[in-house]
UniProtKB/Swiss-Prot annotation:
Family: Belongs to the methyltransferase superfamily. TrmY family.
EC id: 2.1.1.257
Principal location: cytoplasm
Broad class of enzyme this protein falls into: transferase
Record key words, sorted: Cytoplasm, Methyltransferase, S-adenosyl-L-methionine, Transferase, tRNA processing
Protein name: tRNA (pseudouridine(54)-N(1))-methyltransferase
Highest taxon above the source species: Archaea
Gene source species: Pyrococcus abyssi (strain GE5 / Orsay)
Catalytic activity: pseudouridine(54) in tRNA + S-adenosyl-L-methionine = N(1)-methylpseudouridine(54) in tRNA + S-adenosyl-L-homocysteine + H(+)
Length: 204
């Protein structure tokens, strides 16, 4: 299983955005839609070996964490169309209003899609119980020089704003920084690259 954890610094935590202007009204949920596309979709098939967590930290009710579970997801629900994915995120945020403030319980929204009030650190602590953690940063160890385990791997990365120094201090205490290159790449492109690289290594 491959896990991707995305910190979405400004992504809205309520279904209050316009589908006609996702970049301008949602805190860049459009970037999250593209990242999900890169995580799960192949040209003619769907990756069932991927799990994605997205922690949304924008207004009005942060944090909200979404979990997309590849083995349970149906391609017809999470399809490559950006607007339909944004609608699903909006639906999840609507359901998230039912969760008690300090609870970390997850609510199932659709097959393979869950919402919770977990913080970014909560998500990390859940993941590292079962997965070695790799932090995708430009100044990390070259990914081609890293010896990955043969089954479960987890990667954490930021959105267009990135990870803060406080985030990195915490993450480096529980994981290892790795890099796909010397420049800041789009979140969706980084996920696509990592998936392709793990495919080449034969890591499920």
């Amino acid at each position: 299983m491959r896990v991707f954890i995305i910190k979405a610094n400004e992504a809205h935590t309520a279904n209050d955005f316009s589908l006609k202007d996702l970049p301008g009204t949602s805190g860049r949920i459009d970037l999250i839609c593209r990242a999900l596309n890169s995580a799960f979709h192949l040209s003619h098939s769907f990756r069932k070996n991927v799990r994605v967590y997205v922690t949304l930290l924008g207004p009005p009710d942060p944090p909200k964490s979404l979990r997309f579970e590849g083995p349970e997801l149906k391609p017809k629900i999470l399809n490559p169309d950006e607007l339909s994915t944004a609608k699903i995120i909006g639906k999840a945020l609507e359901r998230g209003k039912d969760i008690k403030r300090k609870s970390t319980e997850e609510i199932k929204v659709l097959p393979g899609i869950y919402v919770s009030n977990m913080s970014f650190e909560d998500v990390i602590r859940v993941v590292i119980k079962r997965f070695p953690l790799y932090i995708l940063e430009e100044d990390g160890k070259d990914i081609t020089e890293v010896e990955f385990p043969k089954n479960n791997v987890a990667f954490v990365l930021g959105d267009h704003i990135g990870l803060s120094s406080e985030d990195l201090s915490f993450l480096e205490s529980v994981g290892m920084k790795v890099s796909i290159g010397p420049k800041a790449y789009l979140t969706s492109h980084v996920i696509a690259y990592v998936n392709i690289y793990l495919d080449r290594l034969g890591i499920p």
